[in-house]
Amino acid sequence: MEERRLGPVIGLGTWNTFGTDARLAADVVGASLDAGVRVFDSSPMYRGAEASLAAAVGQRRSEATVATKIWAASVDEGREQYRRQREWFGRVEIEQIHNLLAWRAQLEWLEHEKKEKRIDKLGVTHYAPSAFGEVAEALRTRRFDVVQLPYNPREREVERELLPLPAELGVAVIVMRPLGEGALVRRTPSERDLAPLRAFGVETWGQALLKWVLSDERVDLAIPATSRPERPAENAAAGEPPWFGPDERALVERLST
């Protein structure tokens, strides 16, 4: 799998996946590690997914990059979330402020943790285009290393409004919802429609969508979520070049409508 600034370009999201199901988490996370996935994204918002992820990583913790979040309106609550994360994971490689919630207040103490080398990178996330102006404001402080945003053939606001800024500032980009939270893969194009993409290593529609995202070289990592242990290997295969050119990206866009 190709590597960019955050490691292998396909990670694993945990929103609406295994939750508190420890056995399913172990299967999905184990299959992901076996497939070369290294970045695992989670949040206190994800209904027990952090604890399940920690247990699933287990003895293979050294192979994983944990990208989790602080989702708290107060500093005290944020510090408590972080305390639990340290108990579960030992340290946090990428700590993100979820949906900009109290980001100025949380950033103060998180920067101290980064200075003490208990966190490698600090990030900020948001899912809504209406918040992209504030995301840009946060990035312009030059205090963040990573930004996480939605991007897929149906959600392209970031192309115009945000992706140029991280590229200018040297901020790494994580893409959430590369499959549109599953909506884009519910209808699969025909074999004939996908035929022009075979030369790029595409065997499935899901791979076409992931390769569409990663063919934008401003993107460092895509984090498709799954609760199916057979899926990580398929997703990881989409992280290999060659990448799409304008014609192939346009085809995927047409097939996504």
Stretches found by the model and what they are:
Residues 20-23, 30, 34, 65, ...:
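Glycine/proline-rich, positively charged
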Residues 27-28, 52, 84, 109, ...:
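Alpha-helical elements of Rossmann-like donor-binding domains used by nucleotide-donor carbohydrate transfer enzymes
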Residues 51-52, 132-133, 185-186, 216:
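Short Asp/Glu-rich motifs
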Residues 1-64:
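N-terminal binding-site loop/beta-alpha segment at the start of enzyme catalytic domains
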Residues 33, 37-38, 141-146, 161-257:
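Structured C-terminal cap/extension of enzyme domains
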Residues 53-56, 110, 135-138, 166, ...:
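Hydrophobic packing residues within well-ordered alpha-helices of enzyme cores
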Residues 15, 45-48, 100, 127, ...:
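Flexible loop residues that form catalytic
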Residues 12, 42, 68, 94-97, ...:
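Conserved beta-strand positions
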